[in-house]
């Protein structure tokens, strides 16, 4: 059943009155309303706010929470409807409620004549302002929607998903509604008066008259309560509430209304996250470094060889200082002593805040005599005496806080560059002393040999060391892991080191170097193609200094300590056996 009302508008009492204007043509607007007859449905009722009834105007009404159930084209049609004039676009708008389940339905067509008035210029073609006197239409959705129609679903405010999460507004009083017992939707109308103090904010009825959607969004944001953190609901109450969209204007759907709900409150005093798994074990290295820099280091080096092999010069070149005995205590005439004299001199060297107490031990007269029998004994006695001194400091009841370390850490043995092989004196000395000290053999004045002679000479010395069982530093048995083994193998291949010493500086290609200048060129001491002094310096100072000290303390000194304690215990046992037991006194 279809009813048509043409040329009239429904008033507040339910009657239709005809609108006419002689000044302009009448525009006809049609609304198709589908009425569904349900046996349990209740007639729609109008609830007016009693607090606002006195100031209600006949032309100010608002449909609250109109959900656009269609997709983007429907929203664009509504947006264009609010922005265009009646002459430019007159389309058919269908207002419908939730779809009923009964197949039998009635369609009521309500036609409203809208009088058009020209503003400011009657002859100009432009947008015209028009007003709806009464636009109260409640309908239902047709079974088959047209593709060009805009469907507006009217639901209860309590069924909206957004309204269920929002508290009641503070500015607009809450509309008292009775609980719904059936599935039929109820229409709730709130009539809002136009505020006198804010003329720029239009009423809900004026949103259909104004072509600009900005006041609609401002009024919508005023009427809506302030967003608060949402309370999640497990199940929606109705299908229409889950599919509801913002109503009236398309830009309201594009603007996020509850942006404040998505943004979490930022903490002002937020601190950086703390790694609770960090313990701080790596700080022990810094602690050891500070302690070592306060205490300093000690390094004792001995040089052994015949006179004139450049022992003092090489020591000065190693540390780039005048630290040798001859440099510190020069003598006008120095004769070869009849017996080997052990002379040592100590220097305090500081570099980049690191202090080191360096002791250089010289052995003048070694191998300079005709009869060199047992010439190694004074040197071995000196080394053992330093071990004994350190041992006595350890066994004392009241030990010192820090025992002075005078033990010989390394012994540089100078081999003359004969080009043949090791002498019997060299073999005997290194065989005996390799068990009590770290021996590093070097070829003195290697610049007197050609490159081919140097290679053959080194091969012969290596063969002699292996045949006589002489173990020089770095020893294979003291390699801790594969990494140390790889590094030490490179040094073992270079033994004995062919070195050249010089304490004179020269300018070569704008660079200062240590070397020896001859008629045919300059020998650079630190150039690895000229000699192997740089490798010797790395072994003694830059890479293996601490390892040399550790082997001296844990291997050589421990062997001497065990031997001395065994001798002391055996001597004490022999003394106790010789004594007769005495009778105890009363």
UniProtKB/Swiss-Prot annotation:
One of its GO terms (biological process) is positive regulation of non-motile cilium assembly. The modification Phosphothreonine is found at residues 38, 42, 49, 142. Widely expressed. Isoforms are differentially expressed in testes, kidney, liver heart, spleen, brain, peripheral blood leukocytes, skeletal muscle and kidney. Specific isoforms appear to demonstrate tissue specificity. Isoform 5 is the most highly expressed in fetal tissue. Isoform 1 is detected in all tissues except the brain and thymus, while isoform 2, isoform 3, and isoform 4 are detected at low levels in approximately half of the fetal tissues. Its main location: cytoplasm. Keywords: Acetylation, Cell cycle, Cell division, Chromosomal rearrangement, Cytoplasm, Cytoskeleton, Disease variant, GTP-binding, Nucleotide-binding, Phosphoprotein. Residues 444-447 are annotated as: G4 motif. Residues 1-49, 62-108, 134-268 are annotated as: Disordered. It is found in: Cytoplasm, Cytoskeleton. GO terms for cellular component: actin cytoskeleton; axoneme; cell division site; cilium; cytoplasm; intercellular bridge; microtubule; microtubule cytoskeleton. Pfam families: Septin (PF00735). Residues 134-151 have a biased composition (Basic and acidic residues). The modification Phosphotyrosine is found at residue 278. The modification Phosphoserine is found at residues 22, 30, 82, 85, 89, 96, 327, 332. The modification N-acetylmethionine is found at residue 1. Septins polymerize into heterooligomeric protein complexes that form filaments, and associate with cellular membranes, actin filaments, and microtubules. GTPase activity is required for filament formation. Interacts with SEPTIN2, SEPTIN6, SEPTIN7, SEPTIN11 and SEPTIN14. Interacts with RTKN and ARHGEF18. Filament-forming cytoskeletal GTPase. May play a role in cytokinesis (Potential). May play a role in the internalization of 2 intracellular microbial pathogens, Listeria monocytogenes and Shigella flexneri. This is Septin-9.
